[in-house]
């Protein structure tokens, strides 16, 4: 009899006002018993207590909470996840961009993004083909995406390779350095940065990266 390996869904980052974890927790609750999944939630923030409360309410036994890790351990942590969760609440487009998407791409892992359909992270996931974009509250689609990724090793591998390729093409060191040089040259040529008004937004969301 073939042993089905345990697959880890990783969420690493802030449990903040702009992040949405309810959908994925309800999706995990709905999974069939043959889906061998553990969920690792790493980080802290204002939403952590509510997340713990919901886990307890749903009686989820395959959830593990861990405190934030120091920066030098971050790459190892990201590599430990087989699937990565990135989340963003509805109506936060233009206010926050969950930076964890870039770390996920850099370690070549498939992504489940739960958030607005039209935002930077959704565009990255679609353009790269590295995962699924799911609207907040769509528990059925989230559960289906989890099942597919847990049960299909080839799909995880393919989406992970796409993530790594997209990261190298769009956000690799050479590309990033070239962008920085381009910005510096533009500023030097113009003598100043374009002045743009900064919108006033909720402080909690402003700190939510």
Language-model region placement:
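Conserved acidic donor-binding segment of nucleotide-sugar-dependent glycosyltransferases
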Residues: 116, 127, 132-139, 148-154
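C-terminal alpha-helical cap of glycosyltransferases
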Residues: 173-209
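Nucleotide-sugar-dependent
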Residues: 19, 68-79, 84-105, 110-123
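Conserved donor-binding loops in enzymes that form glycosidic bonds
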Residues: 11-16, 44, 67-68, 170
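A short, well-ordered alpha-helix in the C-terminal region of glycosyltransferases
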Residues: 141-144, 148, 155-169
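Conserved donor-binding/catalytic core segment of Leloir-type glycosyltransferases
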Residues: 2-19, 25-28, 40
